[in-house]
Amino acid sequence: MKQINIGVIGTGWCGGIRTETARRNPLVNEIHIAETNEIRLHEMAQLVGAKTATTNYQDLLKIDSIDAVIISATPETTHFPMARDALNAGKHVFLEKPIAIELEQADELIALAKKKNLKFTIGYSQRFNPKYAYVKKAINDGTIGKPVSILVSRHITRSLGKKIAGRVKLSPAAMESTHDLDFVFWCLEPAKPVKVYSQVNYGAMRESTGGDIPDTQWIMVTMDNGLSFVVGGGWSLPPGYPNFSSTWIEFVGTDGALMVDDSHKDVVLNTMKNGMQLPMSTMPGEQVDHIYAGPMAYETVHFIEAVAMDREVLVTGEQARQVMEVYMAADLSAETGEPVYLPLPTEMLKAANG
């Protein structure tokens, strides 16, 4: 059995999950980590027995024995330079979404990975959620026939929304609905998006932060086969809401309908101290004693296996770029009040990039 050595850049919430998952995997020999928070760096190094622990990610790229790098760093503006440097160093790369901030950056990463013959994948973890995988299967095997109506609505709590929105100027489309856009495009392959219309709604987030941050964003996407669908996302659930993330999915086809309640109401905890809570309701998931509840561990194992066993990755750079172009178009549409046609013209790309 071939073992590989993994480097993890950024060991916060998601990076920590991926680091611990790698530590438990028999295909992984050594773990090397880079983290700018020295307290967290020391904590994770002790927890996983890291071979290298550094505050400078470039140190990992100089280690020839590292086969692959997982980039879980924030803010999102760091994604492109870190991924570019890792690919140039000859490392296979797993990169958290978004793939980049500008489409030209995404194109450069995709081309570089191909040139170097390296695995390059993006963290769209919901593809590894069994409920979502079931929807994909039901479409592929014809259970519900040809899709004619699709709706996905996702909302997270206000406290988590402030944390995410405060990192970088990205919209609910870019930071929340991005997962659902990827999911629907995956289900509808090989159809491609050709038109995007979007509107945003303001309220609690702008009032509480003072920034130009919408509470919700709704997106209608038209595909090249004529089908249109709606994706909505927001981050303003009340602070007392008992879970982190709540999602509703509708797929109606010519031969059936499939509804998915991913609001995490299946396990309800109520205590005198904290009131009602819905455990295991985060999008990445969480460790529960001996087992991991959620998609992120499966996703991490998938990448490790792809590198160690030379398998194809499930999420390609091209697919992540497509999602990025659509949420950029959604933001432009919300700003102008008009539909936006794809591919995005050069002048619109310049406007989107400020």
Describe every region a protein language model picked out.
Residues 209, 224-298:
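NAD(P)-dinucleotide binding in Rossmann-like oxidoreductases
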Residues 2, 100-163, 170:
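A contiguous active-site-proximal alpha/beta segment in oxidoreductase catalytic domains
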Residues 48-112:
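Beta-loop-alpha module in the N-terminal Rossmann-like domain of NAD(P)-dependent dehydrogenases
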Residues 1-48, 72, 184:
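N-terminal Rossmann-like dinucleotide-binding module
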Residues 160-244, 318:
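Rossmann-like dinucleotide-binding domain that binds NAD(P)(H)
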Residues 1-3, 8, 28, 68-73, ...:
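C-terminal helix-rich "cap/oligomerization" subdomain common to oxidoreductases
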Residues 94-95, 120-122, 231, 260:
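Hydrophobic residues in well-ordered beta-strands that form the structural core
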